[in-house]
């Protein structure tokens, strides 16, 4: 399935009418978020310096019409040069399509790319879901309204996990695994797992993997209720609660500074589990709500420096954030950018 258009300069539009089934638009008719290549001729070289084009890394293709024109100053920003004088239009458009297809493949994440290609193949479905790509809904006025509201592709892409071409979601292989590996790379994680039912279920997966009855959990009062369910109810861990600030308007702030003091934490542990109070790492797991509902964002580096040596694990619940590493002023808040030593 082809998602991107091709932007043509005014002079090129008179020479090229279509490219391998892709929509062609003028360079001044797009914001370049839907474009897979910009095609200009050697008389339009000023467009090479367009910041919108360069910011997305969109390929620039130059059609050579005048061999005497010097384009050396622009070569480092040009993806491909096509000698139109010595090529047919069909060969030219084939070269353009190769460039667009490569760019499209580079920007689409693995699973979405595979899913859209699979949908584009228009395979017949003999498994679930039973609406058959949305066609079943067309048998009733209510269903037709439902179908028309969401549009065709959402139903055609509603596929059974038995469609093995897309990979197995349960044993992590194929395109499903490729997507997880891609997400890990993007987020600077060692591994990434996709979990259904949102962060509530993801939290329970982590907590049930790490905690057993009697383990000490250092518990942020701002934690989501799924932390209570997974850590306290299901796993049976013993909580050490950390106090949080609260203003006269009821807004909940961050954990109070003294709660990160080692002697204070060991004192609280002694009250619940005296035999663990003097252990090197008395805390099995600390759970910190990295970004709170009220807008408090913790600096992960500071948290780890304060209590990391007391804990086997620190779990940052990032349900309200997660994008801090991509925002320069918030990078220091990201747990996934930390350089960690043996302690």
What are these regions (language model features)?
Residues 7-10, 22-30, 41-58, 64-72, ...:
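Conserved PLP-enzyme active-site core in the AAT-like
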Residues 1-5, 33, 190, 213-214:
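A short, charged/proline- and glycine-enriched loop
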Residues 58, 62, 79-174:
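N-terminal "arm"/small-domain region of PLP-dependent enzymes with the aminotransferase-like
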Residues 15-23:
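A short, Lys/Arg-enriched amphipathic alpha-helix followed by its capping loop at the start of a domain
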Residues 1-16, 163:
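A short, flexible N-terminal coil/short beta segment enriched in small residues
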Residues 89, 104, 108, 112, ...:
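Generic structural signal for well-ordered, non-membrane alpha-helical segments
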Residues 152-202:
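Conserved N-terminal alpha-helix of the aminotransferase class I/II PLP-enzyme fold
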Residues 35-39:
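Active-site beta3 strand of CheY-like receiver
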């Amino acid at each position: 399935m082809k998602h991107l258009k091709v932007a043509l300069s005014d002079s090129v539009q008179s020479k090229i009418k279509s490219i391998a089934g892709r929509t062609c638009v003028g360079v001044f008719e797009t914001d370049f978020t839907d474009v897979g290549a910009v095609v200009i001729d050697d008389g339009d070289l000023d467009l090479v310096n367009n910041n919108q084009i360069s910011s997305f890394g969109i390929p620039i293709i130059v059609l050579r019409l005048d061999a005497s024109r010097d384009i050396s100053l622009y070569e480092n920003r040009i993806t491909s040069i096509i000698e139109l004088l010595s090529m047919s239009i069909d060969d030219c458009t084939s070269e353009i399509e190769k460039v667009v297809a490569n760019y499209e493949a580079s920007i689409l994440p693995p699973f979405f790319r595979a899913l859209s290609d699979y949908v584009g193949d228009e395979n017949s479905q003999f498994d679930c879901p039973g609406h058959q790509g949305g066609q079943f809904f067309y048998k009733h006025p209510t269903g037709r309204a439902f179908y028309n509201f969401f549009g065709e592709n959402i139903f055609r892409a509603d596929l059974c996990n038995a469609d093995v071409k897309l990979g197995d979601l349960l044993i992590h292989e194929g395109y499903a695994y490729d997507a997880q590996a891609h997400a890990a790379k993007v987020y600077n994680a060692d591994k990434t797992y996709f979990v259904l039912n949102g962060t509530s279920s993801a939290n329970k997966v982590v907590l049930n993997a790490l905690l057993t009855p009697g383990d000490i959990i250092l518990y942020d009062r701002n934690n989501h209720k799924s932390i209570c369910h997974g850590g306290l109810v299901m796993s049976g861990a013993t909580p050490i609660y950390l106090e949080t600030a609260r203003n006269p308007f009821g807004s909940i702030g961050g954990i109070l500074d003294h709660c990160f003091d080692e002697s204070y934490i060991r004192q609280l542990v002694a009250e619940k589990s005296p035999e663990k109070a003097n252990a090197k790492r008395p805390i099995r797991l600390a759970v910190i709500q990295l970004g709170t509902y009220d807008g408090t964002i913790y600096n992960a580096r500071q948290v780890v420096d304060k209590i990391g040596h007391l804990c086997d694990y620190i779990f940052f619940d990032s349900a309200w954030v997660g994008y801090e590493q991509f925002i320069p002023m918030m990078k220091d808040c990201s747990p996934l950018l930390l350089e960690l030593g043996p302690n």
